[in-house]
Amino acid sequence: MSVIAPSLGKSLLLIGASRGLGFAMAEEYLRLGWNVVATIRSESQSKLAGLGQAFKGRLEIETVDITLPSEVTALRARLASRTFDLLFVNAGVKNDDRETIADVSTDEFVRVIVTNALSPMRVIEAFQDLVPPTGTIGVMTSGLGSVANNQAGSYEVYRASKAALNTLMRSFAARHAGDPRAMLLMAPGWVRTDMGGVQAPLSVEESIPKLASTVNAQQGKAGLQYLDYLGRTVPW
C-alpha cells in the first residue's frame, strides 16, 4: 500500500481528472500531500468522489467543459481568490486511429483539434495569472505531437492536434519571455487507459508517478520544456 504524505500546503489546479491519466494525477498528488482542485465534465462520469473520501479536506471537485468558453469563464470567477503552485491541463480525445486526413470529416477534425489544442490553451490563458512566479504551468501532450519524430505516420488527426497544442504553448511561452515560471509540455508515454488501449506498454502506475516527479523537479526552471514522463527532452 502506498504511503500517504502529510499535507505540504502546496496546491494543484488539475483540469480534466475524471478518468485515466487525469484521475491518476489527482490521486498521485493527493498521496504526495498536495491540496488538489480537480475538474470533471460530468459528475456521473467520475470516480473522484471516492478519492475525496480517502483524502478528506484536500480534494475539491469542480465541473467544467473546457470546450465551452462560458464554463471556463465561470470556473475562473469561482476560483478568482485562489493561487496554485501548479496549473496542469489534461485534455484529450482521438478519432478512429485508422482515419487519414483524407477520411476524417470536418466535424470530427474540429472536435479533436478544439478539445486537444484550442481548449487547453484557453484554460491556460484564463488561469495563468493564478500561478505565482515560483509556480509551474503544464499541459498533457503526447510524444505523437513531435513533428521531428513522426517517421511512421498513422494517428494523423491526433498527431496534428497535439502538434498544434505544442506550437500554441510555444507561442504562449514566447509571448511571456522572461516569465520566471516553469512551463511544461508533458508526454506521458503510451499508457493503458480507455484512450490508450489494452495494447499500450505502460500501466498508469508506471507512468504517472514518474511524470509527477518530473513535473515537480522542474519548479523554478524558467521557460518551456517538452519532456516525457522520465524527464527526457522530446524533439519538437
Features from the language model and the residues they span:
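Conserved N-terminal Rossmann-fold NAD(P)-binding element of oxidoreductases
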Residues: 12-16
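N-terminal Rossmann NAD(P)H-binding glycine-rich loop of SDR-like oxidoreductase domains
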Residues: 18, 22-28
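Conserved glycine-rich Rossmann-like NAD(P)H-binding loop of the short-chain dehydrogenase/reductase
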Residues: 32-48
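Rossmann-fold cofactor-recognition segment
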Residues: 53-70
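Conserved Rossmann-fold cofactor-binding substructure of NAD(P)-dependent oxidoreductases
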Residues: 65-82
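Catalytic loop of short-chain dehydrogenase/reductase
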Residues: 93, 97-113, 121, 128-129, ...
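C-terminal helical subdomain
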Residues: 178, 185-186, 197-236
